[in-house]
């Protein structure tokens, strides 16, 4: 092969070489990010261990206490003629036991770091990015600068989530520290009010553990998102209702509505006492 032919061959291979180099860089960067995410599993497991152990012990204590008190309560229900009776008490027992088992399950899952492992798995099958500086700054103005570990929050889009959003109507949802958003539609990342709503769920997770997932799903299927608007907030304040008395979805919706009213320069006085409770972490 003469020199000219050799140079032509090299020049022809250069674009392919650049593509391989770019692909290697992207792959190594992706692997580096995933290894960093995996290392955070152990960090968060150790950091969250004391409160998670405390929540598990509390759940076990409540279960033991309920078991000890079951017989006296059954006797009282059977002998108190002014009450609903033993049959009503027996009908109530399966529901209370079921709730306790769900609480216990989530406390055990928390203890072993399952929320972090779930988030790591999700990040393997979706496009994941951290919050931007602008998103953190705006969220901090509403939630508070130290409300949550903003650096740990990830936004997941695309990938396997496309299958989920095709079936749930494109509704955003939050799994622990990962906020799952569709790329298009009213719940996409560009809608900061929705992102803020989901950040409240992250806040709930950090304060109360993974149980917030079950509580939010229950809220969606029972009392829903509506807290009654500003008029009801004034009445709630007068009767001693606090932020923690709202369900998990109402808590997030209240913060979302407060932000939107601030942006639109509408009155927010009725919201402020509840926002102060939220900023203080009173979930």
Q: What is the meaning of each model-derived region?
A:
Residues 2-164, 185:
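Hydrophobic or amphipathic, alpha-helical segments that drive membrane association/targeting
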């Amino acid at each position: 092969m003469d020199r000219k032919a050799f140079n032509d061959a090299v020049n022809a291979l250069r674009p392919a070489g650049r593509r391989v180099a770019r692909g290697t860089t992207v792959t190594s960067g992706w692997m580096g990010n995933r290894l960093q995410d995996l290392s955070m599993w152990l960090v968060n497991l150790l950091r969250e261990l004391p409160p998670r152990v405390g929540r598990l012990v509390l759940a076990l204590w409540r279960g033991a206490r309920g078991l000890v008190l079951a017989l006296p309560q059954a006797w009282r229900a059977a002998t108190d003629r002014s009450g609903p009776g033993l049959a009503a008490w027996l009908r109530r027992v399966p529901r209370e036991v079921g709730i306790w088992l769900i609480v216990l399950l989530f406390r055990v899952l928390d203890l072993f770091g399952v929320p972090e492992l779930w988030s790591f798995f999700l990040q393997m099958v979706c496009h994941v990015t951290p919050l931007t500086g602008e998103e953190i700054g705006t969220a901090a103005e509403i939630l508070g600068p130290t409300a949550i570990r903003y650096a740990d929050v990830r936004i997941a889009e695309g990938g396997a989530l496309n299958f989920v959003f095709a079936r749930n109507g494109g509704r955003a949802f939050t799994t622990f520290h990962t906020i799952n958003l569709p790329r298009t539609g009213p719940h996409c990342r560009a809608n900061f009010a929705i992102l803020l709503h989901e950040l409240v769920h992250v806040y709930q997770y950090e304060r109360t553990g993974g149980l917030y997932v079950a509580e939010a799903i229950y809220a969606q299927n029972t009392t829903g998102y509506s807290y009654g608007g500003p008029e009801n907030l004034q009445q709630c304040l007068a009767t001693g209702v606090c932020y923690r008395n709202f369900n998990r979805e109402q808590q997030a919706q209240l913060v979302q509505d407060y932000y939107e009213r601030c942006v639109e320069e509408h009155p927010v006085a009725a919201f402020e006492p509840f926002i102060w409770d939220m900023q203080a972490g009173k979930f």
